[in-house]
Amino acid sequence: MSLETLARRYGTPLYIYSADHIAHRLELFQKAFSTVPHLICYAVKANSSLAILKMLAARGAGFDIVSGGELERVLAVDRGAAERVVFSGIGKTAPEMDLALRAGILLFNVESEGELELLSERAAKLRRRARVALRVNPDVFAETHPYISTGMREHKFGIEIARARALYRRAGKYLEPAGVSVHIGSQIRAAEPFGAAAERVARLVAELRRDGHAIRYMDLGGGLGIEYHAERPFDPEAKVREYAEALIASAAAVKDVKLLLEPGRFLVAQAGALLSRVLYVKKNGQKTFVITDAAMNDLIRPALYQAYHEIVPVAARRGSRKMVADVVGPVCETGDFFARDRELAAVRPGDLVAILDTGAYGMSQASNYNTRLRPAEVLVEGRRARLIRERENIGDVLAAERRALKL
């Protein structure tokens, strides 16, 4: 089924994903870590579509969550997958802890002294034993956008390694110190920072074991990046192999430990595209603007992170000329753009364009800004395409307010 057919059937803006691509990327991870005990815990925040979670759960993947809502999504597709869930995040609430305790998740990644105390209280109240890993801050610099760098001491995440041993000693009766966790950021393309962080975690695991703690998990987080520029070489198999070799070598000094990995973007980003229809092409002085029916509420990465995405016409015209333009949406902000001063194949109103590599942090960050309706989503499996999320309608958007106001 062609992209134009999908766009006509389901409308635009429209997210489309390749199930085969996601499955292949998961296989690359499994193969790269096949020499050591491991569990791939997909980072739900990257793309929380129920259909994608279901296909990953069916392939034995675990899940990295950062909210009770994300846990509810995992439980909705496979309640048995709770035993493969790690719960990260710096602001877990008591109700979220209770939900996770009752579900029987694999591991709580604890990020502060206060969180450890609250989790101990909730576990005692429910009489549920909780396996915990302290997320330590390794003070490792990762070359990435500052908003998604998380492993330096000035960041809000984790606990100083120097304080970790003392906090483990304070684990209450219903808490089982079972692991150590680290996560240094997202969209990191070099292997060295991951290896440096893993080395520091491995040393801490050895110290904790000498203290008498039966540490059996090293959660080394996620963050492996992709290449968004089409002209730059990117070999995903070589990249994940290099990443795995760095982590395995750094953790080699620690025996009888299971590695937990939390890939998100690497699995799903390049599986997705956002289809959008060109509404207008206009000029302001020397500037050309391509106005699409997609906007920053559908894909905020360019506005938020100055992120680059390739934008291509779905049906290029023979001998079509090039144009230099800003590709923008209808939202009432100058920051509503997908590309600035971009050379692309000339387009005109009615043309369908694809914004590439939007399978991660696209729909999961979409909003209703300007009371715009969030897009539909389609999953392509082989030659079959199926709707996995209906396009929002105005009734969906207004429902909570109408109930509150009895309108």
What do these predicted ranges mean?
Residues 1-130, 169-176, 210-213, 383-407:
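A charged N-terminal "starter" segment
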Residues 22, 45, 67, 100, ...:
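Conserved, mostly hydrophobic/aromatic
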Residues 41-42, 63, 88-89, 108-111, ...:
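Glycine- and other small-residue-rich loops at beta-strand/loop junctions that grip anionic moieties
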Residues 46-48, 69-70, 91-93, 112-114, ...:
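Active-site-proximal loop/turn and secondary-structure-junction residues that shape catalytic pockets
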Residues 52-54, 75-76, 97-102, 119-122, ...:
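Short acidic, glycine/serine/threonine-rich loops at helix termini
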Residues 64-65, 109, 133, 181, ...:
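Conserved beta-strand positions in the central sheet of alpha/beta enzyme cores
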Residues 138-280, 370:
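Active-site loop/helix belt of alpha/beta enzymes
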Residues 256-407:
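Charged (often Lys/Glu-rich) extended helix/loop segments that serve as interaction or gating elements
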